[in-house]
Amino acid sequence: MTEWDGLRTASEHQTATTAKRDGMDRQTVGSTNRGRLSVEVRTEGRSEILTAAGELDHHTAELLRVPLDEALEQGRSRLVIDCSQLEFCDSTGLNVLLGARLKADAAGGGVHLAAMRPVVARVFEITGADAVFGVHTTLQDALAE
């Protein structure tokens, strides 16, 4: 199991990417996202399960994007996002998931969202994004499909 907690490579990558975009050198790795989102990754059967806990927004999106991209690069195209601990998702987080869906679909897989809390599910309902993902009530349902 791998955990992306804002203290490892994904955080360093996000800080470097942010610094390149806005020209600021913050000199503090992960300072904008430390502790706000963690992502645990594990493989079960033919599924790569990513458990996101915390807030998925423009400050933390890279912490999910990196392990999603790594899974796809390693040929694991059936991605299951366990959203049971995800407390918030903004448009940047939604775009990370939509981007992963396009890549996974192109590779013959897909992205399945499991156990979304009502506040997170509402973002997907309002935007219509729930129609393009496999949305499941529980993680077990997502894995069984």
Report the location of each language-model feature:
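Amphipathic alpha-helical interaction surfaces in cytosolic regulatory modules
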Residues: 55-133
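Conserved catalytic submotifs in the C-terminal HATPase_c
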Residues: 44-46, 84, 116, 140
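Extended rod-forming repeat segments used as scaffolds/tethers
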Residues: 10-12, 64, 137
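Compositionally biased, intrinsically disordered low-complexity segments enriched
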Residues: 15-16, 28-29, 114, 119, ...
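STAS-typified acidic loop motif
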Residues: 29-66
